[in-house]
Structure formats: C-alpha cells, structure tokens
Amino acid sequence: MKFTFHVSPSIKNNLSTQRIMKELSLSLLVVFVAAVIYYASAWGASAALHCVLLLACSLITTFVCESIFAKIMKKDVKTFLKSSFGWVTAIILTLMVPVNMSCYAVIIATVFAIVLAKLLFGGFGQNIFNPAAVGRAVILQAFTGVSVGLITQATPTTVIASTYHWLPSNAAVLDSFLSQYGGFAGLALGTYPGSIGETFSILILIIGVVLAIRQIIDWRVPV
C-alpha cells in the first residue's frame, strides 16, 4: 500500500481571506455611501461631511493602534495591517453609530474595539467578541448624551420598542407608526435618521443576497 503525504489544507477553497474581506469591505462602503447621499440630501452637506469625518476618525485610530501593536510585537507594520483587516472593524463601527455622534466618542470606542476586543486576544480571527459590537457597547454606555446636535428624532426601533412593545395593537396604531417614517417605503429606503448604516434596509438585504450568492457569507447566519 502506498501512502501519499502532503501539507494542509487538505480541502482547498478558491475563496481566500483577502478576497472575502475585500468584497465585504466594498459592500460596507456601498451602504456607507448610500447613507452619506441620504444625509446630504435630507440634512445638508454638514451632516454628510460629519459621516465622512466619523469614518476617517475610526480608520485613522485603527491604523495607529494596529501600527503601534505591530511595532511592539516586532512585526512588519505594512504586512500586519494588510492581514489584520482592521479597516473592516472601523467601517462597521462607523455604520453602527448615529450621525450626530461626536468624533472623540468614536475615537475612544475604536480604541476599545481594536485594542481590547481584538489585538489583546491575538488579532484577526482570534477575538471572542465582535470588536465593532464592543465599540458600540462602549458608546451606548459612556457616550449616549454626546452628540453634535444634528438629529434628535427617535428611530423606528426605539419607538416600536418603547411605545408599542414591539407589537402594535391594531391596524390604526400600525398606520400611525408607519406614517412617522414615510410608510413601508420610507422604512425600506431609509428616509429617516438613525445609525448611519441601519436605515437603508432594502439595500442591505440586496447586498446580503449578493454576498450569499457569491459565498462570501453563509445565508443561514443572518436568516
């Protein structure tokens, strides 16, 4: 009997980590650009620019934190940044905060997300918590009152949870709720304020389907 030995992986997949993260990053940026366009048309250029500024703050903070970590660990900074995919965490975190969040709150949240929730656990693929979710938790606990005064309106999720306890009692109540946000069309198209990346639901669903078809994500997880 003849045995053949070869190094792992024994099962190969054409989907590389680099490709998966690049396509995911592109998808997230599509959502971000759509949000910027909405805020520019509905709330003016200052709101749109603030969205871009929040993303820039998160990205710069991410690269600074990961560069310092790479230096401390005596790793090549450029190689580490390319393989750490920290920008994905920065984009997701930015999409999870409201447009009226202050920049310094996003910077602090990014430090917690990158350093405490990711790098200290070993970096990409080793963290036990979602870094962006940790950053959002920091904002919710420590910076809920910090904003720049662009938007103060309640989002649909907060209204339906606090007012209707997630279940409108009848059709009239449901119509009253929907009218605040332009009906089902308004909810689908995201024509209301909220977290930067949460409102354009129809676009998010379309991107999710595309990513599932391309096998970038497993459709069973979001479903």
Predicted regions and their residues:
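N-terminal signal-anchor module of multipass membrane proteins
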Residues: 1-63, 67-70
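C-terminal ends of transmembrane helices
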Residues: 5-11, 62-77, 114-125, 206-215
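Short, amphipathic, aromatic/basic-enriched membrane-interface segments that mark the entry/exit
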Residues: 14-20, 70-82, 100-101, 189-197, ...
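Structural signature of hydrophobic alpha-helical transmembrane segments
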Residues: 47-61, 100-109, 192-201
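Long hydrophobic alpha-helical segments that form multi-pass transmembrane helix bundles
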Residues: 125-205
